[in-house]
Amino acid sequence: MEDGELDFSNQEVFSSSEMGELPPSNCSMDSFFDGLLMDTNAACTHTHTCNPTGPENTHTHTCFHVHTKILPDESDEKVSTDDTAESCGKKGEKRPLGNREAVRKYREKKKAKAASLEDEVARLRAVNQQLVKRLQNQATLEAEVSRLKCLLVDLRGRIDGEIGSFPYQKPMAANIPSFSHMMNPCNVQCDDEVYCPQNVFGVNSQEGASINDQGLSGCDFDQLQCMANQNLNGNGNGSFSNVNTSVSNKRKGGHRASRAV
């Protein structure tokens, strides 16, 4: 081992499976060492002290040992590259995806709200149409009620005429002259003018003069009797023999007995 010679007496070094096979006889040692240096196994020269200690035992020799070289995997390289600025850029690109998702959800929510509002508008329109129809039906019913009221008033007047109520005339009895009329002013309203249908105060019956030439208000009398003058001939002329007016009694309801003389 001295003088820089190689000591191959250590069989453990060369018998190791990691050393591989010895070089063939036609291969030089230089090529062998180059192969070792190019391989993961490496050779180095260092100085160490062997037991027992002493200056005469200090020597230098070359030993062979395995250098383990850890190569990063491709996936590890990708992971490491993800931490660079490019990875930050990729993370920045992912943020718009989240924003898009939020925008999409907001739009869907807005569309759902708009759809619900449209449904509410349609429902309110239907209710409005129903209310309009009800109002139209109510107006029709009110018109029908008014028509029936008018018909009732007309029928009541006709019934009152049959029993002798004013303004309808009850047919006269057989013993009363034909030119005489019997009137009952019970249903005469205020401010209604009453006309005697026969000749009054020397006026022809065709002209239809009013009492006192001005007409008589229904509120100014209690009982008015138009009676024929029995002393007159049957020429159709007649006069009042008795006119009884009373302002104190102004009753408008109830039937009063009519008298004819």
Curated annotation (Swiss-Prot):
GO biological process, any: response to zinc ion
Q: Where is this region: Leucine-zipper?
A: 117-131
What cellular component GO annotations does this protein have?
A: nucleus
Alphabetically sorted, this entry's keywords are: DNA-binding, Nucleus, Transcription, Transcription regulation
Q: Return the annotated region ranges for Disordered.
A: 1-22, 74-100, 237-261
Composition bias, Polar residues = 8-18
Where is this chain compositionally biased, Low complexity type?
237-248
Q: Locate the compositionally biased regions of type Basic and acidic residues.
A: 88-100
Swiss-Prot/TrEMBL induction comment: Induced by zinc deficiency.
Spell out the PANTHER family in the cross-references. Answer: BASIC LEUCINE ZIPPER 19, CCAAT/ENHANCER BINDING PROTEIN
Q: What does this protein do?
A: Transcription factor involved in the response to zinc ion deficiency. Binds to the consensus sequence 5'-[AG]TGTCGACA[CT]-3' also called zinc deficiency response element (ZDRE). The ZDRE sequence is conserved in the plant kingdom and present in the promoters of genes that constitute the primary response to zinc deficiency, comprising additional ZIP metal transporter genes. Required for zinc accumulation in roots. Mediates the expression of the zinc transporters ZIP3, ZIP4, ZIP5 and ZIP9 during growth in zinc-deficient conditions. ZIP9 transporter is involved in zinc uptake in roots.
What protein name does the entry list? Basic leucine zipper 19
* Gene from which the chain derives: BZIP19
